[in-house]
Amino acid sequence: MAKRQLNRRQNWRIEKIQGERAARAAKRESSAVEALEGGDLGPEQHGLVIAHFGVQVEVEAVDGELAGQVFRCHLRANLPALVTGDQVVWRAGNQGIGVIVAQLPRTTELCRPDSRGQLKPVAANVDMIVIVFAPLPEPHANLIDRYLVAAEHAGIRPLLLLNKFDLIDEQNAPALNALLAVYRTLGYPVLEVSAHHGNGMEQLQKQLDGRISVFVGQSGVGKSSLVNSLLPEVETRVGPLSELSGQGTHTTTTARLFHFPGGGELIDSPGIREFGLGHVSRADVEAGFIEFNDLLGTCRFRDCKHDREPGCALLKALEDGRVQQQRMNSYRSIIASLPENGY
């Protein structure tokens, strides 16, 4: 069934209702914060946001006698939006409740546009983006490349992870091997694992230890199964593949941070089927394709669009085999998806 199209007035009413609900929630939250701050609160200390629940977040104490304990915290009204991975200053109250008083500067942030096109951070202080894909659902180079552009744009190290490699057979092996070869040639780290059978999981754990990582990828590629294998004590519900579409069903409902014994952390975030890049410019996308770096600025025309222009350095590199057709197709698809002002 086709998705119902809403007219302008219906959209306005929906936004008005959502705005009123948000205002009421903010008022209740402000009253709760005032009540807490009017009581007995502990001294200011550092904490780590490990989960987000609407107007409240879960904060783990990182130092002092409360280290390792988790508190459900309210936010002061003047604070910016917080996400999992944020480092904060907070004060503890009674019965596992606290108040966040300040957000500490972020080293990195992973953002994507929301349904209204506004840029929204989804994770903070991430060191590595693990791009998960699998033989089923069939991997798409375009989606992988979108994640890579996002990683390059955010200054976060990417790791390509092929899960369920035990499902590789004679039919899908040639295409998968060709796909992986492109990224290995570019110098991107690639791992092949099976969360179900345990193959390659030790190598993955070594990559994750000592870093804050986030798993991204379309639903059904086994992100929750990977978490269950890496952290058996954590129960992350696993969703089956849809028999009709071959796509996965979303299981994780909120971004949550988990600790590894080796000192690293993992942020398990909701599955993302189509990763939006509407917040980046053409120059950002071009910079996200690392094989373009030595070619950009060497075209005959300064405003070259790398389409059919004579003297285009990228087209010459494509012809010579220095740029793969698969990557050029992804680049053109991403550029075409940008809003006009992104050009």
Swiss-Prot record:
CDD domains (UniProt xref): YjeQ_EngC
GO molecular function annotations of the record: GTP binding; GTPase activity; metal ion binding; rRNA binding
Primary location class: cytoplasm
Cofactor note (record): Binds 1 zinc ion per subunit.
Alphabetical list of InterPro entries matching this protein: G_CP_dom, NA-bd_OB-fold, P-loop_NTPase, Ribosome_biogen_GTPase_RsgA, RsgA_GTPase_dom
One GO-annotated biological process of the protein: ribosomal small subunit biogenesis
Subcellular location: Cytoplasm
Residues engaged in binding GTP: N163, K164, F165, D166, G217, Q218, S219, G220, V221, G222, K223, S224, S225
First-tier enzyme category under EC: hydrolase
Enzyme nomenclature, EC number: 3.6.1.-
Keyword Nucleotide-binding: yes
Protein name: Small ribosomal subunit biogenesis GTPase RsgA
Upper classification of the organism: Bacteria, Pseudomonadati, Pseudomonadota, Gammaproteobacteria, Pseudomonadales
